[in-house]
Amino acid sequence: MATNAKPVYQRILLKLSGEALQGAEGFGIDASVLDRMAQEVKELVELGVEVGVVIGGGNLFRGAGLAEAGMNRVVGDHMGMLATVMNGLAMRDALHRAYVNARLMSAIPLNGVCDNYSWAEAISLLRHGRVVIFSAGTGNPFFTTDSAACLRGIEIEADVVLKATKVDGVYSADPAKDSEAVLFDKLSYQQVLERELKVMDLAAFTLARDHSLPIRVFNMNKPGALRRVVMGENEGTLIFHE
């Protein structure tokens, strides 16, 4: 298959789940996975791609169980936001060790730990080839990190949100449960809604749809997949505005 000589995206928003960082571990951060992801991001920077990153926090904290046990949802979400900051610190450190300039911004003030989120500063950093990691979600409870990824993607005028998952893209059914499940190459926003496919939560998905922000779902566990996506190769599932 012919490949493009240049990346097809100039500016991307990469959404990593917290679970992706834990690798084979049941909890926390797998250092080898973290370093591999940092190297893959470095490849994009060397190609001239501007990279924003949003990381979830599910590897360190999951509020659903505590909410069922009676914890206030707002408190649980604030704890989840802090988990994303911890993951962001780890990713920033991994990027620095890979000799990639990276800045960590938080939607909630954490002076002395990371920068406060600033749209203008983020744009300036991206234009100068810095990787910008956006943490603490949207800064508000009741919003997922997928919503944060779409919001930041729209704000920084990213060409696409790249949602890194543990599967090869969007399937007609859960491939772990249904051997007949079909992997989609492309889908419109409307097709995703009509088929009730699980891409991301509805608030996040609607935000992307309303601003015609394409989403590509791919498997980050496949070495080189991120680069292939950015170079326009047929990797994962593209969700777009028809």
Curated annotation (Swiss-Prot):
The lineage of its organism: Bacteria, Pseudomonadati, Pseudomonadota, Gammaproteobacteria, Enterobacterales. It is an enzyme of class 2 (transferase). Allosterically activated by GTP. Inhibited by UTP. Catalyzes the reversible phosphorylation of UMP to UDP. It comes from Photorhabdus laumondii subsp. laumondii (strain DSM 15139 / CIP 105565 / TT01) (Photorhabdus luminescens subsp. laumondii). It catalyses: UMP + ATP = UDP + ADP. Residues 23-28 are annotated as: Involved in allosteric activation by GTP. The gene is pyrH. It holds the Pfam family AA_kinase. GO terms for molecular function: ATP binding; UMP kinase activity. Its EC number is 2.7.4.22. Keywords: Allosteric enzyme, ATP-binding, Cytoplasm, Kinase, Nucleotide-binding, Pyrimidine biosynthesis, Transferase. This is Uridylate kinase. InterPro entries: AceGlu_kinase-like_sf (IPR036393), Asp/Glu/Uridylate_kinase (IPR001048), Uridylate_kinase (IPR011817), Uridylate_kinase_bac (IPR015963). GO terms for cellular component: cytosol. Homohexamer. PANTHER family: URIDYLATE KINASE, URIDYLATE KINASE PUMPKIN, CHLOROPLASTIC. ATP binds at residues 15-18, 58, 62, 165, 171, 174. Pathway: Pyrimidine metabolism; CTP biosynthesis via de novo pathway; UDP from UMP (UMPK route): step 1/1. Gene3D superfamilies: Acetylglutamate kinase-like. One of its GO terms (biological process) is 'de novo' CTP biosynthetic process. UMP binds at residues 57, 77, 138-145. It is found in: Cytoplasm. Belongs to the UMP kinase family.
